[in-house]
Amino acid sequence: MRKELKQIRLNAFTQCSICHHSKGQWKNPVDGSSLGYKEIDYWVNLAKKLEEGCFDALFLADVHGTYNVYKGSREAAVRHTVQFPSNDPTLAISAMAYATKHIGFACTYSTTYFHPYQTAKLFSTLDHLTQGRVAWNIVTSYLADANENFGLGDQMMEHDRRYDRADEYMEVTYQLWEHSWEEDAIVRDLEKDTHTDPTKVHEINYKGNYFNVPGPHMCEPSPQRTPVLYQAGGSSRGITFASRHAEGVFGMFPTIESCRKAVTAYRDAAVKQGRARDDMKIFPGVTVVVAETDMAAQKKAEEAKSYTSPEGSLALFCGWAGIDLAELDSTDNLVEMKTDAIQGLLSALVLIDADREWSLQDVADYMAIGSLMPKIIGSPSTVADELEKWIDETDCDGFNLVPVTQPSGFNDFVDLVVPELQKRKRMRTSYTGTTLRAVSYTHLRAHETRHD
């Protein structure tokens, strides 16, 4: 009996900014992000194209500070558009939802800088306006100057404590979304002159270590109540947080083997929380360059590399690492560094190529397209082969697609790769369900988002 093929699920990963993960592509004639990112038609057309390709969701990342670690300044980040300038991702969602019927919209929102009472209202509003197609990518944030700009001082709260606070933050939002309003609170009773039954709208009276929120929630129940919940933390504490709350996990795993280990770790953590192993859907990031032939795709990738801004790539890398490497010689071996601050990123580099010494120049070269994402370059058949290999050998559920150029990279994938995956019975050809949770998951409101 032939084993049923696992379906490949896709999210488009980008930011309301310029050349999200491939620094310098604003110079590439096929990239439209430099002018388009601030235009609503740009986002509406992208959403419609992704829906044509049966993507689960368009995922919009966000940051609230600048990458100012490299050379102790934000200058390189500003010069090379390292996630700067960056617009608010929540505001384009309503327009994109109006122009589409099925695709979901996920956006990053920080538990460090926004109060849970405000967050609950925002996502309920978006869930209403999208008719249940919104998701929240939960982050605790990591850029120090954002902390200063929000008036929280020049030192970030300690990493694990940020997650402790985020756990409590989630409890507040669950109570507001799930328990403040009864399902039949809206009565619209003309005879009694009553629109909403006040006996069915409740305070939550939450008192915790970080938050005291009496309630009630300001919004009537939305189609999903709780939005679909995504998370991207890869630390031990981040995995524990995801195992408690996330329905989807985004990750940057450089190799099939590292992805396999991460998938196992996430699924094991979910089981420890009393959840099924497949309750969380896991989406590694991947950068795809596709053309009609392998040779044409390689040529396209090489041309894209010619537009790269190495200093921009290093500003991004140092921001992630939290340590300034600019004073090193460009040929010094980073792997020999003993500092704890960068070990996670160095481990990722070793996984990519254990025989490489990984100088700053090597890092800049590798990050030229797709930053640290694994790269798949080739014809539709070659790309589909590799995506199938990742799915079958790692037990991941799909991918976060990170283009080199935008929107052309997404357009190429929808036009060339999606039909190949559909021909192989690896991708759906239409949507079922109405809400994002119903389309993408097996539950309407999962037990893990209900804290009864």
Place the predicted regions along the sequence by residue:
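Hydrophobic faces of well-ordered beta-strands that scaffold small-molecule active sites
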Residues: 10-12, 58-60, 105-107, 134-138, ...
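Internal, glycine-rich beta/alpha segment that forms the wall or movable "lid"
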Residues: 6, 115-240, 244-245, 273, ...
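Substrate-recognition/cap regions that form aromatic- and gly/pro-loop-enriched pockets
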Residues: 346-414
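N-terminal beta1-alpha1-beta2 module of alpha/beta enzyme domains
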Residues: 1-99, 224-227, 349
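Conserved small/polar residues in nucleotide/adenosyl-binding loops
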Residues: 442-451
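Conserved, mostly hydrophobic/aromatic
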Residues: 10, 54, 96, 126, ...
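Short, acidic/polar
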Residues: 39-48, 233-241, 380-390
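C-terminal helical cap(s) of enzyme catalytic domains, especially alpha/beta-barrels
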Residues: 170, 262-266, 409-422
